[in-house]
Structures are given as C-alpha cells and as structure tokens.
C-alpha cells in the first residue's frame, strides 16, 4: 500500500538523529544548534523533477523558531524520564519542524504526550482546517512508523500481511498535535507528506532527553527503553 514520504522518512531519521548527537557532544541546546547551522546562507541545491526546489535556509529557520516559541522549548526544567526532542526536514517543497514531548517510565513504558508542528508551505492556504488535518494525520502516521511498523522478509516473502501485524495508530493511542503555519512569499507547496519525516527523529531525540538512551534504529518496539 501507499506510504507517505518513504524516502524522506529514512533520510530525516538518520540526519536529524545524528545532528542531535552532535549537539549533545558539543554541549549545545539541540534546537539552537540547528539554528546555528542555518545561520549562514546556503548555496541553492536543487535537482530535476516536479519535486525539485532550491533549499531556503531562512524558511528552515522560520519553522524552527516558530516551533520553539509555541512548544515552550527550554523554558522550564522537565523531570527525569520526561524529555522534549526536535527535528526538521525539507521535502516536497515544504518545510516542517516538530517538537515531541514524551515520557518513559523506569521499566521502559513510553508515552508520547504531545507534538507541536510548524510548517512553511508557501503563501496561501485555501482550506486551513483541511491543512491542519493533513498535518495531524501525517504526525500520527509518523508515530505509527516509529512505534511499531516493520517489514521483515522470510525466505523471500514479507512476513507482515495486514494491519494486524503492521499496526496503525488507533484512536485510543492518538496524540494531541498542535499545528502552526509560517507564511512565506512563495507559491503553495506540498503538505500531506513533509510533516511526517521529522516525527520519528524528534520522538527518539525526546527519548534520549528523557532517559539518556540513544535510539539508532526503528521501530521502537524492538528496543528496551528501561532506565535507572
């Protein structure tokens, strides 16, 4: 079946997890570290095809600054076992930065408490309610991928055959998602897919902030998150 932003998901998880590690190794705030990397103009890097577009560092900074503001990033200390993680990504011509707040019990039970998403998808949003719904759906899909979705192969065949063993997020598991948009003077861009890639790395970065455990592979159902 269809999968939102399949290439960007893996790219974002690898790059945003590694950038988070660099920030902690440097003793820097992870969100400010990203802003510092984007402080200088970046040479346009585009390619061929309908999704190709130059990368705009100012727009990336804009969504990071907005998500810092709305999430209250760094404004108050969090108890051990609770953390906030951040990630951003550019895909389908859209820019999204997201903060995840999560808690992990000492025996490893994970609870995603809230997600804040800030997106720059151009100058005009025709249907704001539907745009917000698209982002909320992307975030829930991203959480499902991070928490328990995995494709395995046995003797040349996929083991998973339905949503019974490739689980989607259920209503009871749905997480509050707060959506904000940053307008820029460019034509409208992608929306349904670019909000998903930052979710898994932001969640794993939150887990590190909460427990000190660094997750470098998905899904999280394969990992022991217990801590002492």
Feature-to-residue mapping (PLM):
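Cofactor-binding beta-sheet edge motifs in enzyme active sites
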Residues: 1-228
């Amino acid at each position: 079946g269809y999968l939102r932003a399949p290439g960007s998901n893996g790219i974002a998880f690898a790059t945003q997890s590694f950038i988070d590690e660099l920030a902690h190794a440097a003793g820097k705030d992870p969100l400010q570290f990203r802003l510092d990397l984007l402080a200088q103009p970046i040479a346009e890097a585009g390619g061929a095809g309908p999704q190709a577009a130059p990368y705009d560092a100012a727009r990336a900074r804009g969504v990071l600054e907005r998500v810092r503001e709305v999430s209250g990033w760094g404004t108050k200390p969090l108890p051990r076992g609770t953390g906030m993680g951040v990630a951003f990504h550019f895909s389908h011509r859209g820019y999204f930065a997201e903060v995840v707040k999560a808690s992990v019990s000492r025996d490893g039970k994970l609870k995603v408490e809230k997600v804040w998403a800030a997106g720059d998808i151009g100058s005009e949003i025709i249907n704001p309610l539907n745009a917000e719904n698209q982002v909320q759906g992307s975030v829930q899909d991203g959480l499902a991928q991070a928490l328990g979705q995995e494709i395995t192969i046995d003797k040349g065949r996929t083991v998973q055959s339905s949503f019974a063993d490739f689980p989607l997020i259920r209503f009871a598991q749905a997480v509050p998602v707060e959506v904000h948009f940053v307008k820029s003077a460019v034509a409208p861009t992608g929306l349904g897919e670019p909000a998903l890639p930052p979710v898994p790395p932001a969640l794993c970065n939150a887990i590190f902030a909460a427990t000190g455990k660094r997750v470098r592979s998905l899904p999280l159902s394969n990992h022991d998150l217990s801590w002492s």
